[in-house]
Amino acid sequence: MVDDSTRKTLSNIPLLQIRAGPREKDVWVQRLKEEYQALIKYVENNKQSGSDWFRLESNKEGTKWFGKCWYMHNLLKYEFDVEFDIPVTYPTTAPEIALPELDGKTAKMYRGGKICLTDHFKPLWARNVPKFGIAHAMALGLAPWLAVEIPDLIEKGIITYKEK
């Protein structure tokens, strides 16, 4: 199910060990530290390979995440806001990543711009609790979704390039 390129990307993202969500206040801080370390490593790896494609930050509690992601198509950079909340049942439940400005523009999206990850990503996440975290959700969830959906939306004329 996972191709060699994805397998290589995954092998370079540190696996997490602490099983804690926002409700476990004391242990959540430790889990959050692991999350940040994995995200930093993933972003560093992306930059080194020339495939830098997102920036994320969180609120102080680490429960709300937001930032930008972008997709290059025909040498044009399409940029989108990205956001998600950490579910109270995290890490058992994966975060639902949203691209609000694309809400309603594709069938592979739920209300509020939440991308559809049900078929491929959620079973993989469930098999890897608590080892997978936010960096893994970006690599296995949002990245492949962007790679499939954005070119299709561009070709259909549903989204167009915006000059900065």
Curated annotation (Swiss-Prot):
InterPro entries linked to this entry: UBQ-conjugating_enzyme/RWD, Ufc1
GO biological-process terms attached to the record: protein ufmylation; response to endoplasmic reticulum stress; reticulophagy
Source organism superkingdom: Eukaryota
A molecular function GO annotation: UFM1 conjugating enzyme activity
UniProt keyword terms in alphabetical order: Ubl conjugation pathway
Active site positions, chain numbering: 116 (glycyl thioester intermediate)
Gene null: resulting phenotype: RNAi-mediated knockdown shows aberrant neuromuscular junctions in the larval muscle, and abnormal wings together with locomotive defects in the adult.
UniProt cross-references to CDD domains, sorted A to Z: UBCc_UFC1
Subunit annotation: Interacts with Uba5 (via C-terminus). Interacts with Ufl1.
Entry's family note: Belongs to the ubiquitin-conjugating enzyme family. UFC1 subfamily.
Described purpose of this protein according to its UniProt entry: E2-like enzyme which forms an intermediate with UFM1 via a thioester linkage. As part of Ufm1 cascade, might play a role in the development of the neuromuscular junctions.
Official protein name in the record: Ubiquitin-fold modifier-conjugating enzyme 1
Source organism (scientific name): Drosophila melanogaster (Fruit fly)
